[in-house]
């Protein structure tokens, strides 16, 4: 029974000992492997990812020492033929370049030229076309011989593998990093009588309710109620990126950072954004803001839908509370 509990390498089936190494996200028996065995297997197979969990290996390709290199790897018939033609064209190009240079220096450009100007012009034209043929021919064969070069590199290189470093799966902005803050009170027409302990904003809420109760906001809290015209104007935000609505009736009220499409969901109209870690939402008769401490990520625009439905489908999770229940959820990547 003890022998079965000893971890063994899934490649060579030998005990790991102190050479235990994890290279991918596999667990169980497939987690145990020798680093040298995996390096040899990746060098031969040239795989870049685990075929089971799909994790890309953390590897590095290095060239073997010069004394260990193989000058002529084992090639197929087609690869050998292409190699012979390539060597022939290389030799032809080098010989032609040497001959053209010699003619140009000693026959055409010498002190006593042996050809006239017409023959020299013809020679120049031939030299230009010959060099173009050699250059384009070499380029074509270089393109055709990519797999030959890969075969040579596969024989003379080896793969070094490094430990697996899993990426964090937790969202960038966790729920505990979200602050919920009511920045504008709700209207009187939306709150009804509620039981004791109702959330701030109910008509008959408990003592010490937050600003937004019927009795009025706390001292110093900005008061701003949207009229029917402003609610209708809120539905006119067609393009994401337009600034949110602020009709200027209260200079102390600042609009949210960026506005999105305003969804007409009956009495619930929201527009929200996640911009550098800040989330702002505004309804037809009140406004809320959600501040995220994690100032990370590019600007992403989202819509907030009621009943916890993700509007924009973007990243980390935050919630916007209305009354005593969670009526909206913000999901953004």
Swiss-Prot record:
The record's InterPro entries line, in alphabetical order, gives: Znf_RING-CH, Znf_RING/FYVE/PHD
One Gene Ontology term of the molecular function aspect:
transferase activity
- Give a yes or no for keyword Iron-sulfur in this entry: no
Q: What is its EC number?
A: 2.3.2.36
**Which GO cellular component term is one of those annotated?**
membrane
Pfam families for the chain: RINGv
Identify the stretch annotated as signal peptide in this record.
Answer: none
Identify the residues that bind Zn(2+) 1. Answer: 9, 12, 34, 37
Q: Compositional bias of type Low complexity: which residue ranges?
A: 195-221
Q: What is the effect of changing residue 41 to A?
A: Loss of ubiquitination activity and degradation of class I molecules
Give me the reactions it catalyses. Answer: [E2 ubiquitin-conjugating enzyme]-S-ubiquitinyl-L-cysteine + [acceptor protein]-L-cysteine = [E2 ubiquitin-conjugating enzyme]-L-cysteine + [acceptor protein]-S-ubiquitinyl-L-cysteine
PROSITE patterns for the chain: ZF_RING_CH
Report any one BP term from Gene Ontology. symbiont-mediated suppression of host adaptive immune response
Q: Where are the zinc fingers (RING-CH-type)?
A: 1-60
CDD domains referenced in this protein's UniProt entry, alphabetically: RING_CH-C4HC3_MARCH
Per the UniProt topology annotation, the Cytoplasmic ranges are 1-82, 143-333
Q: Where in the cell is it found?
A: Host cell membrane; Host endoplasmic reticulum
Q: Does the keyword Zinc apply?
A: yes
Q: What function is annotated for this protein?
A: Membrane-bound E3 ubiquitin ligase expressed during late stages of lytic replication to mediate polyubiquitination of various host membrane proteins related to the immune response. Promotes ubiquitination and subsequent degradation of host MHC-I and CD1D molecules, DC-SIGN and DC-SIGNR, presumably to prevent lysis of infected cells by cytotoxic T-lymphocytes. Binds target molecules through transmembrane interaction. E3 ubiquitin-protein ligases accept ubiquitin from specific E2 ubiquitin-conjugating enzymes, and then transfer it to target protein.
| Quaternary organization | Binds human MHC-I and CD1D.
Provide the protein name.
E3 ubiquitin-protein ligase MIR1
Organism of derivation = Human herpesvirus 8 type P (isolate GK18)
């Amino acid at each position: 029974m003890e022998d079965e509990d000893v971890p063994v390498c899934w490649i060579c089936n030998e005990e790991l000992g102190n050479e235990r190494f994890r290279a991918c996200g596999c667990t169980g028996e497939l987690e145990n492997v020798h680093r040298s065995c995996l390096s040899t297997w990746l060098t031969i197979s040239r795989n870049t990812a685990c075929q089971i969990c799909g994790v890309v290996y953390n590897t590095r390709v290095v060239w073997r020492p010069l004394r260990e290199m193989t000058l002529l790897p084992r090639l197929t018939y087609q690869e050998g033929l292409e190699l012979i033609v390539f060597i022939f064209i290389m030799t032809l190009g080098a010989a032609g370049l040497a001959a053209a240079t010699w003619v140009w220096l000693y026959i055409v450009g010498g002190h006593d030229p042996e050809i006239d100007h017409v023959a020299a012009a013809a020679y120049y034209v031939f030299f230009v076309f010959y060099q173009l043929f050699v250059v384009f021919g070499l380029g074509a064969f270089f393109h055709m011989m990519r797999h030959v070069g890969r075969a040579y590199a596969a024989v003379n290189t080896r793969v070094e593998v490094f430990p697996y470093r899993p990426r964090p799966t937790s969202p960038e902005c966790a729920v505990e990093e979200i602050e919920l803050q009511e920045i504008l009170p709700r209207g009187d027409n939306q709150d009804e009588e509620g039981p004791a302990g109702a959330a701030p904003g109910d008509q008959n809420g408990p003592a010490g309710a937050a600003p937004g109760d019927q009795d009025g906001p706390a001292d110093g809290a900005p008061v701003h109620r949207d009229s029917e015209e402003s609610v209708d104007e809120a539905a006119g935000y067609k393009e994401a990126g337009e600034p949110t609505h602020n009709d200027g009736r209260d200079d102390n009220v600042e609009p949210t950072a960026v506005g999105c499409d305003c969804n007409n969901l009956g009495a619930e109209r929201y527009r929200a954004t996640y911009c550098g870690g800040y989330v702002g939402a505004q309804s037809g008769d009140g406004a809320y803001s959600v501040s995220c401490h994690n100032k990370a990520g590019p600007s992403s625009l989202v819509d907030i839908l009621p009943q916890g439905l993700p509007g924009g489908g973007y990243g980390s999770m935050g919630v916007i509370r209305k009354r005593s229940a969670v009526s909206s959820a913000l999901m953004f990547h």
